[in-house]
Amino acid sequence: MGNKIISMMKKDSKDGGGGGSKSKRMNRSQRKLLADEEMLHRRALSMAIHQAQLSQRFDGSMSRRVGSTSTRKRTLSDPFSNGKQVPDFSESLIVKKFVLVHGEGFGAWCWYKMVASLEESGLSPVTVDLTGCGFNMTDTNTVSTLEEYSKPLIDLLENLPEEEKVILVGHSTGGASISYALERFPEKISKAIFVCATMVSDGQRPFDVFSEELGSAERFMKESQFLIYGNGKDKPPTGFMFEKPHMKGLYFNQSPNKDIALAMISMRPVPLGPMMEKVSLTAERYGKGRRFYVQTLDDRALSPDVQEKLVRENSPEGVFKIKGSDHCPFFSKPQSLHKILLEIAQIP
């Protein structure tokens, strides 16, 4: 494994951010927009630093390093809204609660722009930290099954009022968790949205989706330099974590500099067991769920070809595409992702 990753070169060829004359005067709404985004980012960064400090006691592999090689300039298209009045869609929607489920190594913190924009639209976003992720201080080396890993999501769904339904949104390997949840609670889930995610089929492992990029699971377990041996080198590996340069090239090739810095101090090792577990899905439960897929077209972690293969082999109800997005559209294309989430929510 690794030839594709190790040879990965980071692209920073982006448009600058606007000419001088147009930027001389910024109207009041634009200033407020940028100030609001700055405040949100500072809060997220502060929480991430606090998390990193706490996690040192539980997880020795947590990194506190902050940095980025991105030269991307800030533009007015980056913020979570465009300065115009955001329509309130809540009146026309029956299901208003979104449950946002992060992918491998991430935590609830990664959704901060989506939370802000969905709330502005009159909706009710909820985020979860899966077991061993974000502020959930479980040692990732002890998380061995998808059931354990997804427990915070399952607990949330179990505790919903009897008649309440939610829209699930899963990013990357969070797709396996929302698939598992859809199998468990099809009656509680109005729609499931897979954002460049592992929309697995019955009997498939979440890791299998990445096999074209990472090699076969068997080869990865034997040869990968990213494995973590939480129980000792003489025992099977318990997790994995890419090195910082690899993460930047794989996940964040179009993301803003500040969001890369946030991710670099916030991401945690990925428990290996849940990624290698074959997911059991039935036509009677999972198969009755309404699934939608969001493809990211400048994705280096899960290539557009692989995403296209996923939707061919396990067809969802609808497919949406985001041009110019890396593997983290909540950072690189938040407005586009927000628009798609609203569009899917409004589908009868």
From Swiss-Prot:
Asked if Plastid is a keyword of the record, the answer is: yes
Catalytic residues of the enzyme = S172, D299, H327
Q: Using the UniProt record, give the first listed, main subcellular location.
A: plastid
Give the main EC class.
hydrolase
The transit peptide extends across 1-76
Enzyme Commission (EC) number: 3.1.1.-
Q: Which residues carry this modification: Phosphoserine?
A: S77
User: Cellular location of this protein?
Assistant: Plastid, Chloroplast
Q: Where is this region: Disordered?
A: 1-29, 60-80
Q: Which UniProt keywords apply?
A: Chloroplast, Hydrolase, Phosphoprotein, Plastid, Transit peptide
Q: Which InterPro entries does the UniProt entry name for this protein?
A: AB_hydrolase_1, AB_hydrolase_fold, MES/HNL
- Entry's PROSITE patterns? LIPASE_SER (PS00120)
Which domain of life does the protein's organism represent? Eukaryota
Question: Which Gene Ontology cellular component annotation is one that this UniProt entry carries?
Answer: chloroplast
One matching Pfam family is Abhydrolase_6
A GO molecular function term, named singly, is: hydrolase activity
Q: Does the keyword Ubl conjugation apply?
A: no
Function field: Putative methylesterase.
The Swiss-Prot or TrEMBL record describes its family as follows: Belongs to the AB hydrolase superfamily. Methylesterase family.
Please identify the protein, giving its name as recorded. Putative methylesterase 14, chloroplastic
The species this protein belongs to is: Arabidopsis thaliana (Mouse-ear cress)
